[in-house]
Amino acid sequence: MDTPISKFLPPDFDKSAKIAILAGKGEYPIMLKKRLDSFGIPNALMAFEDETPPELFNAYPSSERYSSNVGQLGKLLKNLKASRAKYAIMAGQITPKKLFR
C-alpha cells in the first residue's frame, strides 16, 4: 500500500500537477518542499521578500521561483498564473505587522 501524502488532500488529487508553495518564515516551507519532492510532486516557490528563507529560495531553479512583497496581491496572482500550478498551499509565518500596513 502506498504511503499517503496527506489525509487532508481530496480523493481526486493529481500527483502529477504542480503545487505552488506560498512560503513564509521558518521550517514549515522547507519541510513541505522536502515532502513534495519525496513523492515526486512538482512544485514552484512563491517567495515573499524578507520572509522566505534564503536557503529555500536558492533551492529552486530560477524558472520555478517567484518573489513579491507581502502586500503585492496582483503580482502574486500573476506569479501563480506564470508558474502554471494547479494547487497552492501556504506554509510558514508572515510577520504580522507586514499584513496590516
Model-derived features: where do they sit?
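Conserved acidic residues
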Residues: A17, S63, K86
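N-terminal basic/disordered segments at the start of proteins
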Residues: D2-P4, F8-F48
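Short glycine-/acidic-enriched loop or helix-start segments at secondary-structure transitions
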Residues: M31-L32, E55, L99-R101
